[in-house]
């Protein structure tokens, strides 16, 4: 595993879970965290520890977004009508980087963020280079014409390890995706259990 790949799996190692369900994740081979003390048996987590871990998993899945940005997203979810945890999932899944990743235009969420930053993506026909850009139902995301033959894109489309969720309609021949609806927690194909209700409890302390 290259140094770059290893860095991407740091979150997996820290949490002790393969949060993206990737075959090369180091936690597929061991059940302890990174570092010289990683093999020590972990004690039972406190309620706070359980809530913190749930937050770290959700933050980590979306590319380890900053605490400031994650809390801002939570606060927006809390202001909206309905279940705050479900609102949080909907907001996270409507991020441009999440949709580019879910559409299988790139292999990882980290690659999605870089891909967007480098200007390879259009939304409704206009280039957008902000990874946290919030999509609305019906928005069309497309790999820019000059970027469609990039190796990273051609390889990602063929990945068998994950499927495109049904709230994103994708044409892989044209490399176009439509964000068709806001998903609920049960719609989202997480590789591990995500518990947004515990994230709500964490911020409600």
Curated annotation (Swiss-Prot):
Gene3D superfamilies: Ribosomal Protein S4 Delta 41, Chain A, domain 1 (1.10.1050.10), RNA-binding S4 domain (3.10.290.10). GO terms for cellular component: small ribosomal subunit. Pfam families: Ribosomal_S4, S4. Residues 94-157 form the S4 RNA-binding domain. The keyword Ribosomal protein applies. One of its GO terms (molecular function) is structural constituent of ribosome. Keywords: Ribonucleoprotein, Ribosomal protein, RNA-binding, rRNA-binding. One of its GO terms (biological process) is translation. Residues 19-45 are annotated as: Disordered. InterPro entries: Ribosomal_uS4, Ribosomal_uS4_bac-type, Ribosomal_uS4_CS, Ribosomal_uS4_N, S4_RNA-bd, S4_RNA-bd_sf. Transmembrane segments: none annotated. One of the primary rRNA binding proteins, it binds directly to 16S rRNA where it nucleates assembly of the body of the 30S subunit. With S5 and S12 plays an important role in translational accuracy. Belongs to the universal ribosomal protein uS4 family. Part of the 30S ribosomal subunit. Contacts protein S5. The interaction surface between S4 and S5 is involved in control of translational fidelity. NCBIfam families: PRK05327.1 (NF003717), rpsD_bact (TIGR01017). This is Small ribosomal subunit protein uS4. It comes from Brucella anthropi (strain ATCC 49188 / DSM 6882 / CCUG 24695 / JCM 21032 / LMG 3331 / NBRC 15819 / NCTC 12168 / Alc 37).
């Amino acid at each position: 595993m290259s140094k770059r790949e290893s860095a991407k799996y740091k979150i997996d190692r820290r949490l002790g879970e393969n949060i993206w369900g990737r075959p090369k994740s180091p936690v597929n081979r061991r059940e302890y965290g990174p570092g010289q003390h990683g093999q020590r048996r972990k004690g039972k987590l406190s309620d706070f520890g359980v809530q913190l871990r749930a937050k770290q998993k959700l933050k980590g899945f979306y590319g380890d977004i900053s605490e400031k940005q994650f809390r801002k997203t939570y606060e927006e979810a809390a202001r909206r009508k309905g279940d705050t945890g479900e609102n949080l999932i909907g907001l996270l899944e409507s991020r441009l980087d999440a949709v580019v990743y879910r559409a299988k235009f790139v292999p990882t969420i980290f690659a999605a963020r870089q891909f967007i930053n480098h200007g390879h993506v259009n939304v409704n026909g206009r280039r957008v280079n902000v990874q946290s850009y919030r999509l609305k139902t019906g928005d069309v995301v497309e790999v820019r014409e000059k970027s469609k033959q990039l190796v990273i894109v051609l390889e990602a489309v063929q990945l068998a390890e994950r499927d495109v969720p049904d709230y994103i309609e994708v044409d892989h021949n044209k490399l176009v995706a439509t964000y068709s609806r806001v998903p609920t927690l049960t719609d989202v194909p997480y590789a591990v259990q995500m518990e947004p209700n515990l994230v709500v409890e964490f911020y409600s302390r």
